[in-house]
Amino acid sequence: MMMFAIKKKAVSVAIVSIISSLSFAASAAPTATANGGTINFTGKVTDVTCTVKLNGGTNSGTVALPPVSTASLAKSGDVAGMTSFTVSLDNCKSAGATLAAGKTAAVFFEAGADVDSATGLLLNHKASGAGAVALELVDNSNSSHHAIIAGDAAQQANTTKIAIDPQGTTILPYAVRYHATGAATAGDVESSVVYSVMYN
């Protein structure tokens, strides 16, 4: 366990606050041309820090999915083996003091080497592993179990925000499942993702 402010860690975790605030359109910004334009960026830096644990352990770890048959992943879009995991927050503070009421948190799953940039699925990086199989992250906070598109900024609006209680703790529920990208072939599956904790 350790306190995190703005820090990342690969594999099943990483943590922290949110992207720094930027404005790309300064007063001296060049005039947009017919072939270009202006991009404005916004963000927020918070002073919230928490102790972050994956499934009650440390901030990094492994989530093991159950073995499934190729028959359950026979065609593109088939899913199987949904496995729950949690990211828990403890000792959350703001500038060293107790958090004000109404603070919420959610995980943002980031783009990376194991993330398919088109679909947000986690790619199988196991050499000679299962074919036509990826992993799909899921918001497990309610029965809808909607898929999370890793690396997509829309997560900030679409992922359920969970309240941080007055004691500075909360549990963020997620899941992962196999997702067929075709007719699956047998073999091992391994992947990873980096995540950050979004505080609001």
Question: Where are the regions that the model predicts?
Answer:
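Mature extracellular/passenger domains of Gram-negative fimbrial/pilin and adhesin proteins
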Residues: M2-S12, F24-N200
